[in-house]
Amino acid sequence: MHSHSHARGPRPQHPAATFEAGARTMTDAVNTRAPEAFFANAEDPLHAGFAAKAAIHSGPGGMPKLGEDARKALEALYDRPRTGKTLAYIHVPFCETRCLYCMFYQNPFREEAVSAYAKRLVEEIRMWSGRAAQNSAPVHAVYFGGGTPTAFSPEDLKLVLGAVKQHLPLANDCEITLEGRIHNFSDDKIEAALEGGVNRFSLGVQTFSSAVRQSMRRVDGRDAIISRLERLCGYDNAAVVIDLIYGFPNQTMEVWEDDLRTAASLSLDGVDCYQLNVFEKSPLARFIANGKLPNAADTALKADFFARSVEYFTLQNWHRLSNNHWGITARERNIYNALGKSACDCLAFGCGAGGRIGGHSFMMERGLKDWEDILSQGMKPAAFLAAPKPNWHLLRTISSDMESGAVNLSRIGRVFGVSSLEAMAEPLLAQWRDAGMLEKRGDWHVQTIAGQYWHVTLAQLLMNWLEPMLPGAMPAHPSASDIGSPDIMQRMSAGRKNNKAEAA
């Protein structure tokens, strides 16, 4: 991937906008369908490429069904055989503490409640075992997300992992990830996870700075984190990956560079770098508004953090797995995250879990009692299901390519029988090239550092640009869900674990 230079000196800070405010700004602009609303700022593409980020994750929207209608629709979908790659997501909706920046906190940790949940989760995994959608083809990656999956006791971990092995047709090389936090991730839990088949650990470190961690209500300090990570790596039995987040209040470039250096000094297999999203209703937004914390980093400063991480890991000879994911050993394959942005199916289990079958996105009930009550009636506890729009598969393929740092519209057009796809997009792509977001290399449109930083916005804008021109397109203006309606995007992000900023 191409590297543009980025500013080194301190730049003036502006109050960071919330995610929702940015999404509204982009939605209003794109709804006009004016070409300029899609164009990038050529004067400073890295720091000020667009007015705001379009969404947490790019993706075409759909028409939703709710409650019983969603459950009936999902029931019918489960008799269709799957094709292509498949994921499985398992949600564990309990946390010992609530981090200030998290919008996806569901339930406080109580040992008896977590143990009871594990047993109900096994019931749900077993419920549709043998149905075509669950068992007709291999599952290539399983992800335990949350919440805090490491809240499970060793016995609970063994129980649920045993059900996964028994009732899901795992591929021979299936990636099985357990997400969690360092705090209370004891040796007996690690060993139970390894015994149960976990071959990848994804731990939410976020920052090694004890001061920044304490301000975000994180529990363990720098030394404790490093000690536990080295202990986990010492088992040498699974990939160990950590998340780092940039943009926290009081997180200077010096703090961020120390985070990067510390991560690279450990025996890790991978590092994921995510930017902080400040949600309007999060405790963090409230603390900032009340003056209890300084502002989080604005878009321009976060761009410098991002560019520095790319520069640093490139110089350390780490390999790029996607715009946000880095690996240093062959163990880190990043399968779930890579396929999660694509059109592939994702089976989903657990309270608040989200998935996708045949292009239909769905989410389980987020209320624990509602989830339990519906499950006890012998039904899959779906709360929400969105049918795919026309051309959803093509659009998600664009989204997936953009996540990896480059898109080949000529190839995508051939695959989906839309020979003019690249020509449709060319006026927009040309402006982005001129603005410094993209470079053309053969048939590939490759993102610069600026393009990588804004890749989610680029993907969403490109899909919005193309959608009305595609065969069979619905004659409607883009809506808030096209750009990423905050409410729906937050619900689905919580369900599919793709906003790692909530990992503990």
Where are these regions (language model features)?
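Flexible, acidic/Gly-rich N-terminal and inter-domain linker regions that tether
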Residues: 1-86, 135, 485-502
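Extended hydrophobic/aromatic-rich secondary-structure runs
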Residues: 38-53, 66, 71-79, 83-91, ...
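Canonical Radical SAM [4Fe-4S] cluster-binding loop centered on the CxxxCxxC motif
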Residues: 82-118
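C-terminal scaffold of the Radical SAM
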Residues: 85, 109-131, 137-418
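Hydrophobic residues in beta-strands and at strand termini
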Residues: 92, 180, 446-448
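Beta-strand-connecting loop/turn residues
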Residues: 95, 269, 442-444
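Charged, E/D/K/R/S-rich low-complexity terminal regions of large eukaryotic assembly subunits
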Residues: 354-504
